[in-house]
Amino acid sequence: MTEKLQPLRGIKDLLPDDYKVHDYIISKARDVGVLYGYKQMSTPILEYTKVFNRSMGESSDVISKEIYSFLDKSNESVALRPEFTAGIIRSFISNGLQHKLPLKLFSTGPVFRYDRPQAGRQRQFHQLNYEYIGAKGAITDAETLKLAIDILKALAIEQDTLLELNSLGCSESRSAYKQKLVEYLSDFKDQLSEESKIRMIKNPMRILDSKSEIDQKIVAYAPILSEYYTDESKEYFDELIKYLDILGVKYSINPRLVRGLDYYCHTAFEFTTNKLGSQSTILAGGRYDGLSRIMGNNDDVPAIGFAAGIERIALMREYDISEVKPVFVLPIGDNNITYALEIVDKLRAQNIATIVEPLGKIAKRMQRVLNENAKFIIFIGDEEQENNSIKLKDLEKQEEYIVDFAKAFELLKKY
């Protein structure tokens, strides 16, 4: 017996009903982005692995455990994108867009991470992504957070989320903090998880984000990053808070919040929910002023951005999405098909969605139409063809009309 082929584990088909929801979410998010001046762009799904290694850091979970990376036929190491930001900054540099700053860019599409599949976490998933490149100062951070809030409002889930906010400070602040954090953690190094023992050497701040219960108990009493802010870092965060208060943005300061990637500085944020169990983060991002230089640009370029998981948004609520109900055209006999196709072409030319059902017994074709919840059927028989007319049936009102094309179009365009 021939093997029944299945999709890869953790990678799902997007069937029409799923795609309808995804398309709705993307459309709503795109519309809000346009109001803020964002323009859509796309980067390749496949990049050189070094694009992500360099930007995300060798010690990150994504690079060390989750990236889909392999050698192609030219023996080049390539990878499926695990996130958008690195590819967008690579594109910004390789296309010489420095003279077009500032740039507000929106992207959407699939990303890939070799993770343990569960509800709200798949190996292929889809993201909304926003990057504000050339964005300097706390005011742009506040605007970016307001954009995120307005997107969640447009999707009717903002009321079910909490904005958690922190500042990672400048490089000087983080350097001083890492030193104190390592000193504190050294007293517990034998108790830390194996993963955190490695992180303690490569990037100790990542231990704050550990999922290990033992690690969490240890870091609960660790030094707080804000205690090591420089005057500049403190002023920056205070200014951001001032703008958020002016805008009426509700937030919770989480001093343990760090981002999972190496390129973040200053503002870091997550919108979380209690409706999705352990997969609580709906949208997350932060500022990354140093990434462009890491990626090969001559100078640092200030930037801030965020991404939101479409699958997780879709799990937050059921969306009542209205659909265009097509008109179905049923030729009664084979000799009526040509005339039926002419009618179909005329209706489509008037932007009326139309489906022709030419094959099979009338009863079976009618059943297919009813299964689609159609509102109108057009029957084309010998009489209609001879008189250059149309028999139009309104399935909701159970009324029939025998009319010419102009009258049929007049009736249909009302719906």
UniProtKB/Swiss-Prot annotation:
This is Histidine--tRNA ligase. SUPFAM superfamilies: Class II aaRS ABD-related (SSF52954), Class II aaRS and biotin synthetases (SSF55681). Keywords: Aminoacyl-tRNA synthetase, ATP-binding, Cytoplasm, Ligase, Nucleotide-binding, Protein biosynthesis. It comes from the Bacteria. Coiled coil: none annotated. GO terms for biological process: histidyl-tRNA aminoacylation. It is an enzyme of class 6 (ligase). It holds the Pfam family tRNA-synt_His. It is found in: Cytoplasm. Its EC number is 6.1.1.21. InterPro entries: aa-tRNA-synth_II (IPR006195), aa-tRNA-synth_II/BPL/LPL (IPR045864), Anticodon-bd (IPR004154), Anticodon-bd_dom_sf (IPR036621), His-tRNA-ligase (IPR015807), HisRS-like_core (IPR041715), HisRS/HisZ (IPR004516), HisRS_anticodon (IPR033656). It catalyses: tRNA(His) + L-histidine + ATP = L-histidyl-tRNA(His) + AMP + diphosphate + H(+). One of its GO terms (cellular component) is cytoplasm. Belongs to the class-II aminoacyl-tRNA synthetase family. Its main location: cytoplasm. GO terms for molecular function: ATP binding; histidine-tRNA ligase activity. Homodimer. Gene3D superfamilies: Anticodon-binding domain, Bira Bifunctional Protein, Domain 2. The keyword Nucleus does not apply.
